[in-house]
Amino acid sequence: MIRYTHIFLLLSLLGCSSALQAAQTEFFDTTFGDFSEELQTAKEEQKSGIFVFFEMDECPFCHRMKTSILNQPDVISYFKKHFKIFQVDIEGDVEMTDFDGSVTTQKDFAFKKHRVRATPVLAFFDLDGKLVARYTGATSSKEEFMLLGDYVVNGHYASTSFTRFKRQQRQSQ
């Protein structure tokens, strides 16, 4: 016999699933896996760089980011304006091309090339494919994630750490 609690649980899970799918379809850009080509597109579109969201399927922190931060309209708008945005599954065997044109897998791109060991890792690359900022773990809030975007877009990474930048921003308010 199906109970109302089972129906509620099923509907709740479906709701989370659709919120997750919405975040994935709106926030992330579609790619054929050639990041060297994506760099060229980012230059042509006058973006600040490329944002890579390193993730794992069963990662609760990745899930929280997708369902509570990456699905927010102002977040989507800001990041789409300034970055090409891609997901990389750190366990993925999908073949891809790195920024320098080397063929690899998502797993090797994450582990060997960028030493990703925990998820999520929020990685920002400049228009030459050079890693300029990296944040390991989920941000504590949408505001912190937006501040991280501002930190990269306005080039603060060149002169200070994100932790120091956050502290300066709090003191100036």
Identify the residue ranges that each predicted region occupies.
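Bacterial N-terminal signal peptides
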Residues: 7-17
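Sec/Tat signal peptide C-region and signal peptidase I cleavage site
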Residues: 18-22
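Typically the conserved alpha-helix immediately C-terminal to a functionally engaged Cys/Sec
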Residues: 63-80
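N-terminal leader/targeting and pre-domain segments
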Residues: 23-46, 158-173
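Thiol-based oxidoreductase modules, predominantly thioredoxin-like and allied folds used
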Residues: 30-32, 75-104
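Positively charged n-region of N-terminal signal peptides that target proteins for export
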Residues: 1-6
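Short active-site neighborhood of thiol/selenol oxidoreductases, capturing the structured segment around
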Residues: 45-60
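Non-catalytic, surface beta->alpha helical segment in thiol-disulfide oxidoreductase systems
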Residues: 109-158
